[in-house]
């Protein structure tokens, strides 16, 4: 009987989770003070009764954090606003069609050392309606090119009016509350947030490009934690 008990105890101990020895918040920015500390790129705007970083269109920003100390994982959480008429995995063009992609990338300038499966998260978003005969699907909450219905995983939909009230282009926004983790080593954390939007038809009747009015994104409430295990 004692042998059986010992075997059970050893089995339970062998299946226990690693002990967390460090879980530290190293960055926290809600942008209400309009601080660009540790940020390269971007400006501010008021949206949804808050100050946000954005809006971006075929653009992005980078967070550089030094002296964060030894760690094994980095976790980033944030509020992401998808503005306007994002089309997800397909824009519906018969030739040279492309997705509306959005990415977070760890250590974006170190391509020779990347394990792309763990150091970049690329997905798509769609604010399209979804009818039986028309539905431009998105990848989120999975990575591209997975297919899910528009706005899946969202926190709030149909927020506000167009960002450009006088423009034909654009539409309401969708809010996603996102957390992503990456394996990370060293004393620094560098994270790049960016999009790759495809909008060949975002041109008004006067021939003036309207890409940013048509589709863009903003971000708020960024928190970054580093974690180590025993």
Where are these regions (language model features)?
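Short carbohydrate-recognition loop motifs
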Residues: 40-59
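Short edge-strand/loop segments of extracellular domains
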Residues: 93-113
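Sec-dependent N-terminal signal peptides
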Residues: 4-13
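Extended extracellular/luminal ectodomain segments enriched in beta-structured repeat modules
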Residues: 68-78, 82-84, 185-190
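Terminal, low-complexity interaction segments
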Residues: 139-230
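Extracellular carbohydrate-recognition regions
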Residues: 15-43, 111-129, 133, 230
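Short beta-strands within extracellular/lumenal beta-sheet-rich domains
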Residues: 55-77, 96, 100-102, 172-180, ...
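Extended, low-complexity, turn-rich repeat/linker tracts enriched in Gly/Pro/Ser/Thr and Asp/Glu
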Residues: 71, 81-98, 129-131, 199-202
């Amino acid at each position: 009987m004692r042998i059986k008990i010992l075997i059970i105890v050893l089995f339970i101990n062998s299946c226990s989770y690693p002990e967390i020895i460090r879980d530290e918040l190293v960055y926290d920015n809600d942008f209400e003070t309009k601080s660009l500390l540790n940020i390269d790129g971007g400006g501010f705007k008021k949206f949804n009764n808050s100050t946000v970083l954005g809006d971006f269109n075929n653009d992005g920003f980078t967070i550089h954090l030094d002296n964060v100390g030894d760690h094994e994982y980095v976790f980033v959480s944030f509020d992401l606003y998808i503005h306007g008429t994002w089309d997800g995995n397909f824009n519906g063009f018969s030739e040279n069609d492309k997705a509306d992609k959005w990415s977070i990338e760890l250590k974006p300038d170190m391509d020779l050392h990347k394990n792309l499966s763990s150091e970049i998260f690329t997905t798509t978003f769609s604010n399209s309606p979804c009818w039986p005969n028309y539905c431009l699907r998105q990848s989120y909450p999975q990575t591209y090119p997975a297919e899910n219905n528009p706005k899946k995983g969202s926190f709030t939909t149909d927020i506000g009016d167009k960002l450009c009230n006088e423009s034909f282009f654009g539409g309401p926004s969708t809010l996603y509350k996102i957390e992503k983790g990456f394996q990370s080593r060293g004393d620094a954390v560098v994270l790049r947030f960016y999009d790759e939007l495809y909008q060949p038809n975002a041109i008004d009747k006067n021939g003036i490009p309207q890409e940013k009015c048509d589709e863009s994104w903003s971000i708020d409430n960024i928190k970054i934690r580093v974690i180590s295990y025993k």
